[in-house]
Amino acid sequence: MEAEVINQLNNTLNDLEKRSEDIRVYMDYQGKKDRLEEVIGLSEDPELWNDPKRAQEIGKESKILEGIVLTLDNIASGIEDNRMLIEMAVEENDEEGFAAVKEDVAGLEKQMADLEFKRMFNQPADPNNCFIDITAGAGGTEAEDWAGMLFRMYSRYAERKGFKIEILEEDDGEIAGINRATIRVEGEYAYGLLRTETGVHRLVRYSPFDSNNKRHTSFASVFVYPEIDDSIEIEINPADLRIDTYRASGAGGQHINKTDSAVRITHEPTGIVVQCQNDRSQHANKAAAMEMLKSKLYELEMRKRNEEKQALEEGKSDVGWGSQIRSYVLDSSRIKDLRTGYEVGNTKAVLDGDLDGFIEASLKQGV
């Protein structure tokens, strides 16, 4: 076995040890370990299961804490074990043992990289599920088809991540695509991953709806906001709400309810409107719409605070949800994020949900 390769492995383990120490401090390892012990104790209380919602929250918190604490524990023990295995492999000239060490160290590096990525999730709601509102801009069929393409892109991204998606509201376009839609994305750090997708998305392409095959520009807006659990208090005055019911519509007229089960809620002080029609029960749709409203009010408050903070920092641009964030030029095979400068040429892969590069660039640059 070459001494250079052995030294390289030992250097990798030393580097992992240093990075592990840094991330333990940054992520408050001891605090999270203590809290995990508390949460495990709570989960073992039989009384907890009398409150299914609370039990679900405890289970979710436990999973997030375990993802940090147990990973750091595994990295620490892995570093120590592999140092001993390297010594044994050298003494016994064990090529197979040495190959196993290289594979295991590569796995430790992957775990560390995943943890370091999670360091970028610095907002309280980052671990939460989220909602995505997609709305077609002006331009009729072109814009509605583009909104439908974005709807598919985010659905495919969620599937790639192993997330669960639920369509809460969908208003089909007259010819193609959608006029607007709201989807719920359920999964660990769904909001943290998707929050930087908020903004206006611009499409440039030769239109399939134009017999002259002219180049068209279309716009659609995306708004991502977190699902709020009971740990974050949002007070809503019932007097501030206007609640309307209407008949739910389905794609192509399918499964249309004959009762007014769909619910639209308007929060009059802010003008925020939410609607839900995915359930046949008006009561269930109203409950879902209220959860969406709480989440939107939370996101509005967070954005107000961020804007106030940015106003104090010279040179910071407005990153309100109305800002154009990304350009998709299909005939040139180019998709570029206007905030980070990140650019790719494989437009098909991106529209099929391969958003990791864009999301990572946005989080790294603190967008």
From Swiss-Prot:
SUPFAM superfamilies with a match to the protein in the record: Release factor
Name-wise, this protein is Peptide chain release factor 2
* Keyword Transmembrane in record: no
What Pfam families does this protein map onto? PCRF, RF-1
Q: Which residues carry this modification: N5-methylglutamine?
A: Q254
Q: Superkingdom, according to UniProt?
A: Bacteria
Where does this protein come from, organism-wise?
A: Neisseria gonorrhoeae (strain ATCC 700825 / FA 1090)
Stated role: Peptide chain release factor 2 directs the termination of translation in response to the peptide chain termination codons UGA and UAA.
